[in-house]
């Protein structure tokens, strides 16, 4: 559902005055100004005023704001659970009872001028396909537009988004290129990662050279575009699980000093709900890790923070507590360090914030488990893989 002229519904808490608009100036009061009662588009207060108005309306209808995600509102329990996701003036409604959904729509129509856009097919650039088997998310049209804008439509495709063992540097001696053009392309690719975890590492890697890009960096970006050209239909499929309840399962991994400029490692985090990927993350670590154990431990802590938040959000959506989150790690030393303070001489310098995982393991919220390197699914988020491992 879409709210028409949403910002005009916001009620101002501050005194705001505006000049009389041309064509509506009161004769004899030309030098007077108008006192606004409601918000107008262009006011700094308008977005906040609209959000406060919508929040008030949803709370009045019996909804509760999610403590984990403030853009999500919840009503009812179990089979009568109604979930409303909010993005500015767009509302996504999900529930197991059609009567409850229709009732909510009627109540919203009586409160605001609304447009009912029907079943969700397209949202913020994401194409949504729903069936009895599940839901598929992709960005085919958006990806095709990127190729068209960059002049790469119909280019020769590649099997992987980045060459294995490729190492780029900020100190590249290759000819410089227009930074604005480079940033525009990479920024577009960053949004595509929302439904393409296979692009997370490569896009994150080329994002490190936004300040002074060269033709060498642009070549890596074009490689990503060539890969996209051959995988336009790729996206995320979420299968409906009918028998048992889907469990939250996470994977964390890291490379070792992969950034040749700073020698910092890259963290890769991937979470599944059942067999469905729900969140992924590839980012350069904040500190230089002195060992593979430390790099893996930092990555595991990052995954723990994400897993705790996901478990809390899922608990709210389901209306019941989620069990312990399993976290798969392919480094035995990091697992041992998460369970007890071993290797003191080699780990005593690690920042205290990275020891948060120990508390979560101790109180049972997270279970760290060993997994083989070849089975580590988060590996794709930490380095450029060869074709046989990437596919």
In which residue ranges do the predicted regions lie?
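Alpha-helical coiled-coil heptad-repeat oligomerization segments
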Residues: 59, 99-110, 174, 191, ...
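C-terminal reverse transcriptase regions that engage the nucleic-acid substrate
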Residues: 40, 88, 116-236, 372, ...
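Structured nucleic-acid-interacting core domains from mobile-element enzymes and related host factors
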Residues: 226-252, 319-321
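Short acidic, Gly/Ser-rich segments with clustered Asp/Glu that frequently serve as metal-coordination loops
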Residues: 3-10, 90-91, 254-262, 333-335
